[in-house]
Amino acid sequence: MLIKLLTKVFGSRNDRTLRRMRKVVNIINAMEPEMEKLSDEELKGKTAEFRARLEKGEVLENLIPEAFAVVREASKRVFGMRHFDVQLLGGMVLNERCIAEMRTGEGKTLTATLPAYLNALTGKGVHVVTVNDYLAQRDAENNRPLFEFLGLTVGINLPGMPAPAKREAYAADITYGTNNEYGFDYLRDNMAFSPEERVQRKLHYALVDEVDSILIDEARTPLIISGPAEDSSEMYKRVNKIIPHLIRQEKEDSETFQGEGHFSVDEKSRQVNLTERGLVLIEELLVKEGIMDEGESLYSPANIMLMHHVTAALRAHALFTRDVDYIVKDGEVIIVDEHTGRTMQGRRWSDGLHQAVEAKEGVQIQNENQTLASITFQNYFRLYEKLAGMTGTADTEAFEFSSIYKLDTVVVPTNRPMIRKDLPDLVYMTEAEKIQAIIEDIKERTAKGQPVLVGTISIEKSELVSNELTKAGIKHNVLNAKFHANEAAIVAQAGYPAAVTIATNMAGRGTDIVLGGSWQAEVAALENPTAEQIEKIKADWQVRHDAVLEAGGLHIIGTERHESRRIDNQLRGRSGRQGDAGSSRFYLSMEDALMRIFASDRVSGMMRKLGMKPGEAIEHPWVTKAIANAQRKVESRNFDIRKQLLEYDDVANDQRRAIYSQRNELLDVSDVSETINSIREDVFKATIDAYIPPQSLEEMWDIPGLQERLKNDFDLDLPIAEWLDKEPELHEETLRERILAQSIEVYQRKEEVVGAEMMRHFEKGVMLQTLDSLWKEHLAAMDYLRQGIHLRGYAQKDPKQEYKRESFSMFAAMLESLKYEVISTLSKVQVRMPEEVEELEQQRRMEAERLAQMQQLSHQDDDSAAAAALAAQTGERKVGRNDPCPCGSGKKYKQCHGRLQ
């Protein structure tokens, strides 16, 4: 109560921010007559003038009124469009490292031109981030004339572009691209073998469109570049045959419940659990198929890979549904994004799940992957000096934006008041009753010429509604992942009188639904339209537009509530743009996933008490409140998961930044000999210490062991025992110096043969390759550690602290291994003539290119964190702890690569 009173007196923080910014808007408006007097050349010349002022030390913020006034005037001349005052407010919010919540249809694309222009004046580059390639290309092409009129360059960063084209796009003042492509380019740059292979500049200012989709919905899914691991496709096929024999039971076995099935599914956490009966049956079937020996246990260490295959196959059959989670197209399993309903070509689930789904669908099984580099969007976007974003729905997630990204949310007022009617939810007992009610509503609306947009949460549901509409004889368009190419065209015409459009989730985001349909699309369809034709099309459109407004505007139907209120609000936001009339209603049933998992008992009890008849719906504020509470539960759970993921990834992030910064320094220098000399001293000191402990008696020295180690690891054949026999006065310090001097001498002789330049080139190559190889192993080990770290909780230890402690010691061990392997490799190298070295280098480059082509981009969910990490680890674990390490170092496995585990 007190807070409400204070807010009334002083205004909310949002009100105070807008009040302050409105003063600047008044200054910009006052400059308009002055700007109108300028010629095109003078207006364009303002860009050079602003840049000169910045170079002299003027602060960017001081340029806001003039810069915004220049962009507004240029937009009037180039597009015939003048920025509204609320768009100027939005532009200022975006410049202040904030998130601007602007309703659908308020012109976010035009608003973005203001902060993009202002921040491009610094010459450090602006990245405009969109959710898909179509929007990146559309926005870049639409805004290019404006930016080029003002003397700025525009680049587009698309997947599959060659490196020179990407470099050119990044060198532009303003670059448009998707979040995935920016992230993957960052990872690829940090895997480059020469400075010329890198494409990105230093990350300066990111302006993220649909910021909620990118920074929240996709935050749980790291970007991964992976290379192929060993082939185990045959095993997936064999295990896949067994799974259909298992029967699902409703819930997990407990003291009070014993089911008859073989596995249960936890829909909340999307996990599958085998029962005791299921385990016994699986083991029997594996023995029968000849996959496992009689008397063996599936849980024995020898069968850990088999357990991995069984778990993946079980999840593929029980949790992943065709046309909901993925589609099969041209013999390939393609993931469907749960948030947007779009297909994600080239993305693959990890942990063997994708292969298990391929086996289930009977398509060709592709190899498993091993992680080469990965980063989460949360950590990628926090690398920018300045970050801002815009969306139609951010206020519900304001706390998360603030706590994770340190971004405040400012709600920008609409240009015209919103008059859309949001009708209360209707809840039915069954799915069939709900669908029937939706069909009746559509019939009623279209009969009076009102366009209808039906939002569904999966391809399967959109096809179900489509079939029912076809049976009822209602013409309609379907917009889902399967019809991706027609997306913008279908959305543009969804406002046609009596048009019915079915869309999965937020497919078509970024394209406005214009009441009466899009007259621009009709003009674009004509080859050479005359002025008369265009006028006629516009006149016809005006008649249709008025008719649709008269009928009540666009009507939105939600076929079920999404887990997130924000996505429901996005669907509603497609209607009522720029003060247009419109309406919306959600239809629910007790069989919907959200109701079944989170709100069932209370609401179904209420419905039974009311004695509802088939086909009747309940419409009550209590029900709406119960559903909102269910959504809040899911949202807070998802927030906890994202926060947890970030806390763990922050540990890896510190290490990633250290490694990438080291790697970039290496790439930028041509001579690393000083570093090599310093490392050599450290390595030889540590090696000698193992056999001649410092300040020890000669009786404690292991000279034969030292000689053998130097021979095996550094190709140094030194007669140390002879030296000691012939020179009794040779003490420890002198001996150490002599061994190091001998190693340097041998190395210098090699350098004389091949030449200093070639040796420097070779040293750099060895350091980069060794670093990449060890970093890849370290990532797999970190994934493996992460998978089991929660078990430390049972020992009363904090898993996060344990993860930090262990990962740090693993990182330190990796850096030690790096030094050792670099010196060992350089010492063992057999010198050849320069021509031979060049030939070998050429072969290495070809091999690196081949590997790059084989690399696949995969996008993994947080609960499957290690791409084939188990495969990598168990392959290593077959070596005994006390056996010699397979890398050939001569050390025991536990003292060499075994340390990573």
Curated annotation (Swiss-Prot):
Q: Indicate, by first and last residue, each region the UniProt record lists as having compositional bias (Basic residues).
A: 891-901
Compartmental location: Cell inner membrane; Cytoplasm
Q: What happens when the gene is disrupted?
A: Essential. Leads to loss of translocation of lipoproteins Lpp and BRP.
The reaction(s) catalysed by this protein are: ATP + H2O + cellular proteinSide 1 = ADP + phosphate + cellular proteinSide 2
Q: Where is this region: Disordered?
A: 859-901
**What does the record give as the organism's lineage?**
Bacteria, Pseudomonadati, Pseudomonadota, Gammaproteobacteria, Enterobacterales
Q: How does it assemble?
A: Monomer and homodimer; probably dimeric in the cytoplasm. It is not yet clear whether the form that functions in protein insertion is monomeric or dimeric. Part of the essential protein translocation apparatus which comprises SecA, SecYEG and auxiliary proteins SecDF-YajC and YidC. Makes direct contact with SecY.
This entry's comment on induction and repression of expression is: Repressed under conditions of excess protein secretion capacity and derepressed when protein secretion becomes limiting. This is regulated by SecM.
Instruction: Tell me the cofactor note.
Output: Binds 1 zinc ion per subunit. Zinc is required for binding of the SecB chaperone to the extreme C-terminus of SecA.
Q: What InterPro entries does the entry give? A: Helicase_ATP-bd, Helicase_C-like, P-loop_NTPase, SEC_C_motif, SecA, SecA_CS, SecA_DEAD, SecA_motor_DEAD
Similarity annotation: Belongs to the SecA family.
Stated role: Required for protein export, interacts with the SecYEG preprotein conducting channel. SecA has a central role in coupling the hydrolysis of ATP to the transfer of proteins into and across the cell membrane, serving both as a receptor for the preprotein-SecB complex and as an ATP-driven molecular motor driving the stepwise translocation of polypeptide chains across the membrane.
Identify its membrane topology class.
Peripheral membrane protein
Q: What is this protein called?
A: Protein translocase subunit SecA
